């Protein structure tokens, strides 16, 4: 049996042992194994959260939801997909019909209806946590700085990206909404309750 490459012979009676052994051959073997890995690189945003909230059975892509709390309470939105990092629902009015933009909302603040819209052709690529992250512009104490100018450019670029994505999503969804009679008027109307109405007994 031949000795390994890193083996260093020691004379009889010599108790001195080298402190380090050459490991170049081992490192090369490890690098070869790393190169053989296949598949696309998975980033942190592509991995779903370990505690991702499960959606109700009635909340499926394309379902029309009624917002019951917040700034847009009473308005209807179309559910696009679930954010894999926060578990929030990504919805849109669409903005062209009722003024509700692309936004995130928790499922506890919506009521799902039986009406659905085909959203298979809607491109939601890039609409994730990073898409909704706000860019804060902090003014320096002594006038403008390079960092402030750079932040403003980032803010304008982000704003243009959001507007362009909103137009793209609205174009696809509005086309599907127009296929269903009176659905456009339904999406534009507010949801209200009258005296004697019980939400838990209503069928949406």
UniProtKB/Swiss-Prot annotation:
**InterPro entries according to UniProt:** 60S_ribosomal_eL6 (IPR000915), Rib_uL2_dom2 (IPR014722), Ribosomal_eL6_KOW (IPR041997), Translation_prot_SH3-like_sf (IPR008991)
CDD domains per the UniProt record, alphabetical:
KOW_RPL6 (cd13156)
Q: Which UniProt keywords apply?
A: Cytoplasm, Endoplasmic reticulum, Ribonucleoprotein, Ribosomal protein
Any one Gene Ontology biological process term? cytoplasmic translation
The record's principal subcellular location, in a coarse class, is cytoplasm
Signal peptide positions (record): none
Protein location: Cytoplasm, Cytosol; Cytoplasm; Endoplasmic reticulum
Give this protein's Gene Ontology molecular function annotations: RNA binding; structural constituent of ribosome
Show the GO cellular component annotation of the record: cytosolic large ribosomal subunit; endoplasmic reticulum
What quaternary arrangement does the UniProt entry report?
Component of the large ribosomal subunit.
Cited function: Component of the large ribosomal subunit. The ribosome is a large ribonucleoprotein complex responsible for the synthesis of proteins in the cell.
Q: Which family does it belong to?
A: Belongs to the eukaryotic ribosomal protein eL6 family.
* Protein name (Swiss-Prot/TrEMBL): Large ribosomal subunit protein eL6
| Organism of origin | Entamoeba histolytica (strain ATCC 30459 / HM-1:IMSS / ABRM)
Point out the gene that encodes the protein. RPL6
């Amino acid at each position: 049996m031949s000795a390994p490459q890193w083996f260093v012979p020691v004379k009889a009676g010599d108790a001195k042992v080298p402190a380090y052994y050459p490991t170049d051959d081992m490192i090369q073997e490890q690098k070869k194994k790393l190169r053989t890995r296949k598949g696309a690189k998975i980033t942190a945003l592509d991995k779903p959260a370990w505690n991702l909230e499960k959606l109700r059975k009635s909340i499926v892509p394309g379902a029309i939801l009624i917002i019951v709390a917040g700034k847009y309470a009473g308005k209807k939105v179309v559910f696009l997909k679930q954010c894999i990092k926060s578990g929030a629902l990504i919805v849109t009015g669409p903005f062209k019909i009722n003024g509700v933009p692309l936004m995130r909302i928790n499922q506890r603040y919506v009521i799902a209806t039986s009406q659905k819209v085909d959203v298979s052709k809607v491109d939601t690529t890039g609409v994730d946590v990073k898409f909704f992250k706000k860019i804060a512009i902090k003014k320096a104490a002594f006038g403008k700085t390079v960092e402030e100018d750079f932040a403003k450019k980032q803010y304008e670029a982000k704003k243009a990206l959001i507007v362009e994505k909103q137009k793209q999503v609205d174009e696809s969804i509005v086309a599907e909404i127009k296929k269903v009679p009176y659905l456009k008027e339904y999406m534009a109307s507010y949801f209200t309750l009258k005296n004697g109405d019980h939400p838990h007994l209503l069928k949406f």
